[in-house]
Amino acid sequence: MLTWLQRDSLTFPPLAKAMREPNGLLAAGGDLSAERLIQAYRHGCFPWFSQGQPILWWSPDPRTVIFPDELHISRSLGKLLRQQRYTVTFDQDFAAVIQACAAPRAYADGTWITQSIQNAYLALHQRGYAHSVEVWDNGELVGGLYGLAMGQLFFGESMFSRADNASKFGFATLTRQLQAWGFVLIDCQMPNDHLHSLGARAISRSDFAGFLRDHLDQPNTGPWVS
């Protein structure tokens, strides 16, 4: 039976209670307050729902992740990186990045990044938890991504690209920086071909929970929340 969250409690059910079908559905309801979102990521779940649906919380098994030292750089991406084809910045325009991620895609009917999601993650950005990566081409924003940093873990949320390999360029740059800062894992949530091309692989929910337990409260050497 699906658990419905109460607005006056930040408690989530155990991850083992998540449904097998649909894979990982853990709970519904609650709200998108910064406090609840922070607790959700610490617990091992994330919000994902469409316009008109209740807030749905997920913890899929297996979980798609990238270990920074396993980042795969294709020949074409490596060439762009060597040429420094684009300029990459962090936290320079979070609002523009999340708005671009929310824009309609040719391969999808709608977006899960509703206005309420945008507002919630902007609040997390203002608190220092959510971060953006911007990819620029001669001053024009052509790609980027956003996610949350906690301890030695980065939780990726969404990315966009308006130019050849721009989002991969930004992701590769971020991954190298995260590794230098002592991050050990990037949570990618759900699998897709784009992520697999960058080296993503699946780990069990229990293994993912172990990374949360061991690394959420460990310091990183970067400027982000630790």
Curated annotation (Swiss-Prot):
Record keywords: Acyltransferase, Cytoplasm, Transferase
Catalytic EC class: transferase
Localization, UniProt: Cytoplasm
Domain of life, source organism: Bacteria
Catalytic activity entry: N-terminal L-lysyl-[protein] + L-leucyl-tRNA(Leu) = N-terminal L-leucyl-L-lysyl-[protein] + tRNA(Leu) + H(+); N-terminal L-arginyl-[protein] + L-leucyl-tRNA(Leu) = N-terminal L-leucyl-L-arginyl-[protein] + tRNA(Leu) + H(+); L-phenylalanyl-tRNA(Phe) + an N-terminal L-alpha-aminoacyl-[protein] = an N-terminal L-phenylalanyl-L-alpha-aminoacyl-[protein] + tRNA(Phe)
EC number in record: 2.3.2.6
One GO molecular-function entry: leucyl-tRNA--protein transferase activity
GO biological process: protein catabolic process
Major location (coarse): cytoplasm
GO CC term (a single one): cytoplasm
Primary role: Functions in the N-end rule pathway of protein degradation where it conjugates Leu, Phe and, less efficiently, Met from aminoacyl-tRNAs to the N-termini of proteins containing an N-terminal arginine or lysine.
Similarity field: Belongs to the L/F-transferase family.
Name of the protein this chain belongs to: Leucyl/phenylalanyl-tRNA--protein transferase
Organism: Pseudomonas fluorescens (strain SBW25)
Taxonomic path: Bacteria, Pseudomonadati, Pseudomonadota, Gammaproteobacteria, Pseudomonadales
